[in-house]
């Protein structure tokens, strides 16, 4: 059975891990790094870059370099948070075929699921390279506060990448799994997870292998990217005051600002001041303009103070929902790159009244937890029971547009709940079931999940028909809805498909495109390797031919010259098999040349040995018998 891998698909960085015996272990990527930037770039010639290579070229190719794509996954184009993102990224966010947010690169539209799949493929390839076998199954993490549409979209991304997603697991829960794997005594812990694009807080009770999530809360549009944007705005405003030029209108300058903002934010976690220095950032009539601004830690803290404060409300709500006081929490675990910021750590300490635990790597702990869950599913990890919850209330729209809950938030999953409803009008023959997710009293203010019709209800006065509606949430947090007319036993059920989500046909097409791209990428790689080998053989043969060509016969010389000409011609083209064949032909033709070189070397060595014979001393050796006693 092939290994199940654990993947943390992050907004800024992603990470992959496996169970190595009883211990989860992070796998390094092709560049030798333990985390991979969640960045995808498309070049002019159609080549696609993923991870660090994509991030490195972002400044010179800002409109075709896609990052923070997780903030768009499962979101409608009309969503206000998408409009906010649209104004702040150099690439184009467009309306997809079904109204959801897509992105454009080199004139082609991509769904966030497809872009996420490119990142997942990179993780999959790293695992396959490490394990030396194909990988087809994975556990993928998502923010605890992701709704059904976002969870389904993440699962679809896995499918496009060629992975069967066995489980979607919440990021704070995964972190708790990694933290508490060896823990025997009972503890109540809070996981504060401030990542690149999302914030979650979960309260759990752990001990004796049981991980029970008591509550979860968060904000799926609050993270390190927002901190970066505050720095970008500050730098752009200061530059505009001094030079009268708004750098936000220049996509290349904006990308340089973003990169420098991220660097400044990281540096200011360990230093008191950072000098932002961007020469030739813009031009005016007088010539080039340079940006040079000193940014202090205190200034950064002032810029982002309200963002940090926004994380405290969900912490209060999570404690309230869990029925716990701050003093009941035994440990606070910090997760996500932004939790390294001293001001964030101080805010957490001030709220919970205890110093947070810093013994886990905030960039890797989520992937490690995903690997633990993978180990549980594989049967390698015993005696671990994970009881997670649904983050948002689920219900349907009833008369007057009211949101009627069926499953309250923080209900342990998997779960199933039923409730009986009736018709609103006399002789109504069909009802439309409209499912929503959220906490607002009116349905329209919550996240619309989907709808279906239950037809063929017998004519009856309003209020008489009995229609049973059942919500079913699986262990991934994905919703199914079922409606049944009790009089006729007619029923209808659907797996909720996000309004604007990918259809099965879309996913199938994207899977095929991903496979085709993989084949194309492998072909390009094979061509590069064949050309490298061919060019190396040409170089070494020409060098040897120049030095030792006079030591071989005319027929061998002709064969080598022909071989060189043929291989050089093949190297001009892109036929891998032709290059490989001509390379082998030249290797065969130059074997006599190799013998001549070897003979010349032997002769040189022989002369050297003769020269040293004068210094050789003859000696007699006695064979030692180990059985004889030593003196």
Swiss-Prot record:
CDD domains linked to this entry: ASKHA_NBD_HSP70_HSPA9
Cited InterPro entries: ATPase_NBD, Chaperone_DnaK, Heat_shock_70_CS, HSP70_C_sf, HSP70_peptide-bd_sf, Hsp_70_fam
Keywords, ordered alphabetically: ATP-binding, Chaperone, Nucleotide-binding, Phosphoprotein, Stress response
Gene induction: By stress conditions e.g. heat shock.
Pfam families the UniProt entry points to: HSP70 (PF00012)
Domain of life: Bacteria
Secretion signal, residue range per the UniProt entry: none
Modified residues (Phosphothreonine): 198
Keyword Phosphoprotein: yes
GO molecular function annotations of the record: ATP binding; ATP-dependent protein folding chaperone; unfolded protein binding
Function: Acts as a chaperone.
Protein family (similarity comment): Belongs to the heat shock protein 70 family.
HAMAP family per record: DnaK (MF_00332)
UniProt-recorded name of the protein: Chaperone protein DnaK
This protein's encoding gene: dnaK
